[in-house]
Amino acid sequence: MTGVVELVFETHALTTDNERGIATGWLGGSLSARGRGLAAELGTRRRNDRIDEVLCSDLARAVETSEIAFGGTPLRVTLDWRLRELDYGDLNGAPVDAVARERLERVDVPFPGGESYRDATARVGELLDELATSATRRRVLVIGHTATRWAFDHLLDGKPLEEVVDAPFDWREGWEYTVRPTAASVAG
């Protein structure tokens, strides 16, 4: 089973922007009081879950989630920019509704000043290819964003990107995927 990685995906914890209906995009963002509590619960929930390593988006809200959840544990947390949320460009920091109205149009066409969902999926695919070829990683927890999960659904579960982008994002306590050597080699 060389190269097979169990991937556990968790979104960053609740932010002040989430609570206000703001699409943070590539802005840093910060956890709300409730979000800090949820991050602590994430650490408790996953601490004895055979996690070998944590990969985390380098955006502030994801980093804060990882620090609260896994700070003071022996788990190594590696930050990776490829796990970032979609760059909404001119709409970073705009109301969620304004971004949601544009989602389907932005599967292949970038947001003005930003990127497309296919662009974000391609960068996540590069990371998945690296994971699939690494014999040292077996069960990896990823802390990311909506676009990260949609990329996983597309690349690892074979769901059409247009469908996952158009579906509602229902939060839950993690999603699990399997990364195989050939699973992520198609970035679109």
Where are the regions a protein language model picked out?
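Glycine-rich phosphate-binding loop signature in dinucleotide/nucleotide-binding domains
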Residues: 2, 47-50, 131-138
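Generic beta-sheet signal
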Residues: 7, 138-146
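Short aromatic-enriched loop/helix-cap "lid" or pocket-rim segments at secondary-structure transitions
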Residues: 19-22, 89-93, 154-155
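Generic structural signal for well-ordered alpha-helical scaffold segments
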Residues: 40-47, 125-133
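Phosphate-handling substructures
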Residues: 69-126
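Domain-level recognition of soluble alpha/beta enzyme cores
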Residues: 157-185
